[in-house]
A protein has these predicted regions:
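Serine/threonine-rich, repeat-prone extracellular segments and beta-strand-based repeat modules
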Residues: 2-41
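N-terminal, intrinsically disordered, polar/charged segments of Gram-positive cell-envelope systems
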Residues: 9-11, 49-53
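Interdomain boundary/hinge segments at the C-termini of tandem beta-sandwich modules
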Residues: 42-50
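Low-complexity, Gly/Ser/Thr/Pro-rich intrinsically disordered linker/tail segments
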Residues: 170-198
Length: 198
């Protein structure tokens, strides 16, 4: 028996972004060139975290917390405290699918800084507030938060609760950098990637 059998899986017919059942082939080849194959199928299911669902959930929340007569700052305040008050921190391994992260925050009310940030993104988008995602220069860990612009330039908007406390609602760059220096470089970011933060 060859302990170094090479195993490949042919998934060339799988369309990962389209729900369905697809054929796959396992191919094993030993050192002598003997080859064996086995056919199987792989089922791709539609994620509940699609863009339409996330937008719907975000609009439901916005409908409960935002009114037409609110100022831009009042809308930020309502979104900030909805996220802070409705999501509980729990480590999550997924840092790639923003829709899944936003869905987890809006539906299950738990997640890490990526979930807080992407839930905020979905709510800010639903409220018509200009925003972008910002992240730290990776040191010991990576942290995600938002930048927002309600007509006065870009400001920091970080809804993730911190053990040391703090409110990061419409925070200017000087203040967040001071906080960062005093808290293990929590918000060190590449200023060339995010120019013009107030």
């Amino acid at each position: 028996m060859d302990p170094n059998v090479k195993l490949d899986v042919d998934t060339s017919q799988v369309r990962q972004k389209e729900a369905g059942t697809y054929p796959i082939v396992y191919i094993a080849v030993d050192a002598s060139g003997n080859r064996a194959t086995a056919n199987a199928s792989l089922t791709v299911v539609k994620s509940a975290a699609d863009e339409e669902t996330v937008k719907k959930l975000a609009k439901e929340v916005i409908g409960q917390i935002i009114t037409d007569d609110m100022s831009g700052y009042d809308k930020l305040y309502a979104i900030y405290y909805w996220v802070r008050g409705n999501i509980r921190y729990q480590d999550q391994p997924n840092l790639e699918d923003w829709l899944k992260a936003a869905y987890d925050g809006l539906k299950y009310h738990q997640g890490d800084c990526y979930v807080y940030c992407m839930t905020s993104r979905a709510l800010l988008d639903a409220a018509g507030i200009k925003n972008m995602v910002i992240d730290t220069v990776p040191l010991r860990y990576i942290h995600f938060w938002n930048l927002v612009d309600i007509g006065e330039g870009w400001y920091h908007f970080d809804t993730t609760p911190r053990a040391s406390g703090g409110t990061f609602l419409y925070m200017n760059d000087a203040d967040i950098q001071e906080y960062s220096r005093n808290h293990q470089n929590s918000h060190i970011y590449d200023h060339d990637r995010f120019p013009g933060v107030q």
